[in-house]
């Protein structure tokens, strides 16, 4: 069985940069590793991602949004994550179930039990072995975002504040799985903390 590592954070937190750095490092020391993302880790998922992030001139109900995320996740788990773990790979995923809990429950206000049930259904109960939360203040997140924001990035500041609070609550409730890192630090300093965390857990 492999090892499943997820990276979480609000928009423009720097998690994708850290996944890329860790992926390159693990490859350099001879580890079997893949990197993937949600939404959009599969060909079908890329189409779902386009729908989710595009701006529409018609109502996009929150439940419809949630179901699309979970559809993407189910395909992703069955096609990429589980087969890779079964083959003994380290799997690095840019977002996973904690993003859905933060975005759809804490920020959108959908009932926690609904979100939790659908997360479990889509993943067959598969949880990450380890999750890195790259935490940055909302003001820095919004400053880092480009002018051409997608549908989610374009939400108001209150949405992003609820999102950050949600991620921190999730991490507080599952301290054994989470490593919370100050995302305002130097990129390579963050990378070192991540690598050291893996060494401390005898993953590498």
Curated annotation (Swiss-Prot):
Record's keyword terms, sorted: ATP-binding, Kinase, Nucleotide biosynthesis, Nucleotide-binding, Transferase
GO-annotated biological processes: dTDP biosynthetic process; dTTP biosynthetic process; dUDP biosynthetic process
UniProt binding sites for ATP: 9-16
GO MF entries: ATP binding; dTMP kinase activity
Name of protein: Thymidylate kinase
A GO term from the CC aspect: cytosol
Role played: Phosphorylation of dTMP to form dTDP in both de novo and salvage pathways of dTTP synthesis.
Domain of life from the UniProt record: Bacteria
Family: Belongs to the thymidylate kinase family.
Catalysed reaction equations from the record: dTMP + ATP = dTDP + ADP
Source species: Sulfurihydrogenibium sp. (strain YO3AOP1)
InterPro entries given in the database record: P-loop_NTPase, Thymidylate_kin-like_dom, Thymidylate_kin_CS, Thymidylate_kinase
Documented EC number(s): 2.7.4.9
Signal peptide: none
């Amino acid at each position: 069985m492999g090892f499943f590592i997820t990276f979480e954070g609000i928009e423009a937190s720097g998690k994708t940069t850290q996944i890329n750095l860790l992926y390159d490092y693990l490859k350099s020391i001879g580890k079997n590793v893949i990197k993937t993302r949600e939404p959009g880790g599969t060909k079908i998922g890329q189409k779902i991602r386009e729908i989710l992030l595009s701006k529409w001139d018609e109502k996009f109900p929150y439940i419809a949004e949630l179901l699309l995320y979970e559809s993407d996740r189910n395909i992703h788990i069955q096609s990429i994550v589980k087969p890779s773990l079964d083959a003994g790979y380290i799997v690095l995923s840019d977002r996973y179930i904690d993003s859905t809990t933060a975005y759809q429950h804490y920020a959108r206000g959908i009932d926690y039990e609904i979100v939790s049930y659908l997360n479990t259904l889509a993943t067959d109960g598969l949880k990450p072995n380890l999750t890195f939360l790259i935490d940055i203040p909302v003001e820095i997140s919004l400053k880092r975002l480009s002018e051409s924001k997608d549908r989610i990035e374009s939400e108001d500041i209150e949405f992003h504040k609820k999102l950050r609070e949600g991620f921190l609550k999730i991490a507080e409730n599952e301290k054994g799985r989470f490593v919370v890192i100050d995302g305002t630090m130097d990129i390579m300093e963050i990378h070192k903390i991540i690598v050291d965390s893996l060494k401390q857990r005898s993953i590498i």
